[in-house]
Amino acid sequence: MTMIQYPLYENPYGDIRVDADTVIGLHMFTAGENDLASYVTSFSPFAVKLQTYFRMFGIRHERVSEQTNAVGPRHKIPFISVGNTLITDSGLIIDHLKTVLGDPDAHLTPAQKALGRMVQGALEDHLYWIILYYEFFSDSGWDFLSNVMVGGATNLPAEIQEALDLRRADFRKRCYDQGIARFTEAEIIDKAKRDMAAIDVLIDNKRFLLGDDRPTSHDAVVFGFTQAFFQVRDMHPEITDFVRTLPNLGRFIATVTTRWYPELKLAFEPHQP
């Protein structure tokens, strides 16, 4: 039996020149032009993670709104461009920028770096699938998102509606193959609550995940993967009602939003210390 040979894109790091004056193209899905755009910048947690990293650490960039991940060099969003050179994957992009523009995590102890790495893994490899579940597998989540983004899939031309249906079917299969869609919704809700309650405990009374004085790349990850749960209740009301009771994570979301996303509104009232 002949195995399918999948294409592989190797990031051309040697072809890209970045310094403090370089304006990087940040290619990402955006929230579009609707009421939700006042509360979230994107529903892609990896895109929000990367955009937050750029904003936190003053990396010059311009946002390029993309409609499909097919334009990405690995068929993934987000990616960056400098001239005609493309670099993909939010984690690899951040790692490369650390080497050429300075590492905001350099002051962390080995134990702090290890903790940040474990938090990142929990969010990117576990909570991410719960996000996908509500965006594509859950009927109520899909209906809400499609109504907000495009006024309902049934109102679109047939060919666009068919493309959206195929995209949803693809992600539904991914969710089932990965395993998250094999759980009941109550079990999925509990998993999400446990993940974010753990982050709340780790933040404690600090301003950021690993300290009070300054953010690190791990704070961009935490914000990217949790902000929509606070800001968009109608998509996952049971989870949102729970996370809004978490005082430390809630204050963190409010801090990052207020400082680095002044154009956004807060959809909740954070607990005061």
Name each region found by the language model:
Residues 49-56, 96, 191-202, 255:
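Amphipathic alpha-helical segments that form well-ordered structural scaffolds
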Residues 44, 87, 106-113, 182-189, ...:
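Generic detection of long, well-ordered alpha-helical segments
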Residues 229-273:
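Long, positively charged, glycine-interspersed low-complexity recognition regions
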Residues 129-248:
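GST-like fold's C-terminal all-alpha helical module
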Residues 118, 122, 166-170, 184, ...:
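Catalytic cores of nucleic-acid editing and processing enzymes
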Residues 2-162, 230:
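GST-like domain detector, emphasizing the conserved glutathione-binding G-site
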